């Protein structure tokens, strides 16, 4: 017996989330704990975004397990939501039909492009002569 499953990943800065999407009964777990335990509440709503965008009917027969490592809390949440969104699209492409995949992609892209495409911005390294990458120490002429 082979189970229908796909594996996708989401990234934000140094945080990486790997999502395993398979046929099931609608469970969503992040690092082994339910999605309802994500703290603080504002970040929990960010994780819920891909789910609320497409409606809960698309999740009835799907289980999602997400493992996330690296980065801070906010980066991890953005990586999780990207992994979930990409996992849904991949699952619908592989096991449902092309039309529903295109519909999901269109919904996600119109709401927020980073749900499907990784944010390529990275931190610029600090240089000498100042406090940060671009900021310089104040200059005095006398």
UniProtKB/Swiss-Prot annotation:
One CC-aspect GO term: cytosolic small ribosomal subunit
**Compartments (UniProt record):** Cytoplasm
- So which domain of life are we looking at? Eukaryota
The GO terms describing molecular function are: RNA binding; structural constituent of ribosome
Chief location bin: cytoplasm
Coiled-coil ranges per UniProt: none
**Membrane-traversing stretches:** none
What are the record keywords, sorted? Answer: Cytoplasm, Ribonucleoprotein, Ribosomal protein
Determine if Membrane is one of this entry's keywords: no
Which InterPro entries does the UniProt entry name for this protein? Answer: Ribosomal_Su5_D2-typ_SF, Ribosomal_uS9, Ribosomal_uS9_CS, Ribsml_uS5_D2-typ_fold_subgr
- Keyword hit for Cytoplasm: yes
| UniProt-listed GO biological process terms | maturation of SSU-rRNA from tricistronic rRNA transcript (SSU-rRNA, 5.8S rRNA, LSU-rRNA); translation
Q: What does this protein do?
A: Component of the ribosome, a large ribonucleoprotein complex responsible for the synthesis of proteins in the cell. The small ribosomal subunit (SSU) binds messenger RNAs (mRNAs) and translates the encoded message by selecting cognate aminoacyl-transfer RNA (tRNA) molecules. The large subunit (LSU) contains the ribosomal catalytic site termed the peptidyl transferase center (PTC), which catalyzes the formation of peptide bonds, thereby polymerizing the amino acids delivered by tRNAs into a polypeptide chain.
User: PANTHER family recorded for this chain?
Assistant: RIBOSOMAL PROTEIN S16, RIBOSOMAL PROTEIN S9
Family from the record? Belongs to the universal ribosomal protein uS9 family.
Subunit structure as annotated in this protein's UniProt entry: Component of the small ribosomal subunit. Mature ribosomes consist of a small (40S) and a large (60S) subunit. The 40S subunit contains about 32 different proteins and 1 molecule of RNA (18S). The 60S subunit contains 45 different proteins and 3 molecules of RNA (25S, 5.8S and 5S).
Protein name, per record = Small ribosomal subunit protein uS9
Provenance organism: Candida albicans (strain SC5314 / ATCC MYA-2876) (Yeast)
Taxonomic lineage of the native organism: Eukaryota, Fungi, Dikarya, Ascomycota, Saccharomycotina
